[in-house]
Amino acid sequence: MNKKTRIRSLFPDARLRYDEAMALTLDSMRAWGPNHSVWVIAWSGGKDSTTLLTVILHLLSEGLLDPPERMIVCYADTRMELPPLAHTAQSLLKRLRAEGVEGRTVMAPMDKRYFVYLLGRGVPPPNNNTFRWCTRQIKVDPMETEIKRVVAGAGGNVLMLTGVRQGESAIRDGRITMSCSKDGDECGQGWYQQMT
């Protein structure tokens, strides 16, 4: 295959093109960003949250978005990353801090960490299909605790940004749909939920 050959998508209507996705993101941020003095980005270091962080920083650096009074990036340190990835995450937080972004590292308390459950309590290891106890415990709960602190300190005027990508697999899409539809939450580009 030569470089000029373009592979057509098997699902042409299932995805937004880059320019469409960027325009929708920019429109959403212009609509909701100015209403919030604090923006919080939940960052795991994975593809989705890193894409979100990169896009928001790009839009701000290009002057396409007005910056908030405060921007906070909360990194979920699971203590399970490979050392080079953990080092890179901390290096990026340091760079963000140098640019005026508040970088915070959140992690589960010792008694809720992966190996304490696996080795200390004998809980079976998680799998991707049916038994995913660790994601909530070592990522979601610590992030939620920190975000509640931020919201309380900001008087509730916080825009929470999370990277969610659908279309990776049917199992993942089902998980996203299930988690986003409980408690009145909404997920996906262009959706906004105002907490009271």
Which stretches of residues belong to each language-model region?
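ATP-dependent adenylation/nucleotidyltransferase module used to activate substrates
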Residues: M1-T196
